[in-house]
Amino acid sequence: MNKLIRFGVSLGRDLLGRFDTLIAERGYASRSEAFRDLIRGSLVEEEWRKGGEVAGAITLVYDHHKKDLVNRLTDLQHDVHDLIISTQHIHLDHDHCLEIIAVRGRAAEVRQLADSLRSVKGVLQGTVNMASTGKKLG
């Protein structure tokens, strides 16, 4: 781990009060830890924006009774198997499934996969959760 460096941040009283409330609600041990998380979050967003190597999760909710839906989703995943680290399939009820697809690759390729999966008829919801490979977060 890198050596920690102290520096000052100037904030308005109201903004600091709201930040302190957020810190308490989320259970951070200190302002510093919360601030580090905010910085890391911004760095992850920037990695995704610049199109570098990223990690993340694509989540899908779908009705598995829709004709050919499961086969179509599987085919799309096999077409880019090098992006997919792992998948988890969860039965929400008799009709609906949740699929979580862990991915790693170039941001544009991950977005394209997510868009392809979300656009399949029968997919009720699809989201992409951005994460980092951790290589640039220090």
Where are these regions (language model features)?
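Short Lys/Arg-rich basic patches
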Residues: M1-S10
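Short glycine-/aliphatic-rich beta-strand segments at the starts of folded cytosolic domains
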Residues: G52-H64, L98-I100
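Short amphipathic alpha-helices in soluble, non-transmembrane regions
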Residues: N71-L76, Q112-V120
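Short, charge-rich, low-complexity interaction segments located
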Residues: F35, V44-G51
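Short amphipathic alpha-helix segments
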Residues: H64-I84
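Helix N-cap motif at beta-to-alpha junctions
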Residues: H65-K66, V103-V110
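Short amphipathic alpha-helical segments
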Residues: V9-L11, F19, A29-R40
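Conserved short beta-strand edge segments in small beta-sheet-based binding/regulatory domains
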Residues: D82-I90, D115, S119-G134
